[in-house]
Amino acid sequence: MHRYSGENAFLHQDLAFPYRLLKPENAGGESLFLLHGSGVDETTMVPIARQIAPNATLVAVRGRIRQEDGFRWFERITPTSFEQASIRAETSYFAAFASEAAKRHGLDLARATFLGYSNGANLVSSLMLLNSGLVRKAALLRAMPVLDDAPATNLTGTRVLIVAGAADETYGPFAPPLVTLLNKHGAEVDARIVPSGHEIGGPDAAIVRQWLAGPALVARQAG
């Protein structure tokens, strides 16, 4: 049996977004907010999160917009254009949700990592740009810029990892503009490419795990 209670952990539905809390027996102070891709639900991000941070508390969140048999985070117009009012509204609700969930479960947002995939990663990038200071660490898998008009947000002190797929023909070309955008706003961006398409897997987990350990390893070596 895994040390987590599993994907079927209780579904909390009393905050703005439904979510499951998965806390390992040997949980430390690390936590990951998980934002899934389009047309699925919160359980799909748990396996990769377990690979990335086995001792982290996981907050697996479900998007509120229906898409086929699953969910997404905001309305889309085409595969690469999105309803701006929906982005801003859902991002605002998520900012409040993250603060409330962290307070309820004793999580430190300053130490939390927001791990998003595809549509979920795009919600996280919007969250950073529209709510300065809320997100301090973000790992964005297969992300793209979605805001037509980003405010002049100061992201100094925010660490961001962007992982694109070399064979992701639709969304891969949008990764460099996102890197440029977040750098422009002062974020510390690490951009990587994996030899895959839009799907995510072991290579992504390895990169995120290494990225998260980086500053801690440097600090230990310096000490």
Each PLM stretch: what is its role?
Residues 10-107:
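Serine-hydrolase catalytic machinery in alpha/beta-hydrolase-like enzymes
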Residues 161-164:
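Short beta-strand/loop motif that positions the catalytic acidic residue
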